[in-house]
């Protein structure tokens, strides 16, 4: 399938994004606005923590060098982390996760707009997906020794509530269905695929490798 090639173009479009500041933002306050769509601090926090959790739960967390006992705004990506994540500039982990949250919200907004234009609406099958997710989340909360509401705050920040979580899931499920419908609707010839490949070889002709990192000193001579 051509999923890797057909990256949804509108994910990276230039759109009006009002970034939240670093002060404490109350739960109902608009933290980010994307194309006229307002997102609360809790919604921003969800995508921030999603990005954070994906890093700290990855197999390469030891290479990223995140210190969980130090504020993310006080520690920067090391050279290995920048190389692995494709980051070219120096930045703190807090800035990296904020940027990841912004990109997720941009993508979500554009997919929601696409769904609305197509007339795709939330249906019973989508609700079943959400119900399954909520059931799984509740199971993990119990295994960890938390109530569902406490586990939500642990995973996604103190502003997160069950109603906000359900709203986020509804948006993401609808966006996901539209994205898949869009991909499935695309048609292309072998010649078009070949042309695209030839124009973007550097994106596909890459080596697969693993990192082995260790510290040591040279043998004395």
Q: How should each PLM-predicted stretch be described?
A:
Residues 62-71:
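Alpha-helical membrane-embedding segments
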Residues 1-29, 36, 71, 75, ...:
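Peptidyl-prolyl cis-trans isomerase
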Residues 34-63:
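Short extracytoplasmic
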């Amino acid at each position: 399938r051509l999923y890797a090639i057909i990256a949804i173009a509108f994910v990276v479009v230039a759109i009006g994004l009002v970034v939240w500041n670093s002060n404490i933002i109350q739960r109902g306050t608009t933290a980010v606005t994307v194309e006229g769509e307002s997102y609360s601090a809790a919604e921003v926090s969800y995508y921030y923590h999603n990005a954070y959790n994906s890093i700290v739960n990855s197999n390469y967390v030891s290479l990223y060098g995140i210190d969980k006992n130090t504020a993310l705004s006080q520690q920067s990506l090391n050279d290995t982390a920048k190389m692995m994540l494709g980051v070219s500039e120096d930045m703190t982990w807090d800035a990296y996760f904020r940027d990841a949250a912004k990109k997720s919200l941009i993508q979500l907004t554009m997919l929601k707009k696409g769904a609305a234009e197509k007339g795709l609406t939330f249906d019973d099958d989508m609700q079943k997906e959400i119900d399954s997710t909520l059931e799984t989340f509740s199971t993990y909360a119990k295994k960890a020794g938390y109530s569902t509401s406490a586990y939500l705050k642990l995973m996604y920040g103190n502003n997160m509530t069950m109603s906000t979580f359900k709203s986020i899931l509804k948006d993401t499920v609808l966006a996901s269905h539209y994205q898949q419908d869009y991909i499935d609707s695309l048609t292309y010839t072998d010649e078009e695929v070949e042309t695209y490949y030839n124009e973007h070889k550097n994106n596909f002709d890459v080596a697969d490798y693993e990192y082995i990192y260790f510290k040591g000193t040279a043998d004395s001579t």
